[in-house]
Amino acid sequence: MVVLKWTNKYSGETGYVASVSTKVQCFVNTFNMDDAKRYSEKAVKGILTKLDNYHETDNNIFEMIEA
């Protein structure tokens, strides 16, 4: 299982994805890796596509981290 770490391209702030809201089309962040949602590596591709479609990748870089 992996978690998604995000880094803001402009501020350098970092954290983890706690959830992805399809209703609001955004992600909810957490600064504690223990609170981050665990994903299978297979599921991450779809999550990253959603985040790109929600324009979250305009300001953030997402990377997989082993949980």
What are the roles of these predicted feature ranges?
Residues 1-32:
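Short aromatic-glycine-(Arg/Gly/Cys) micro-motifs in beta-strand/loop hairpins
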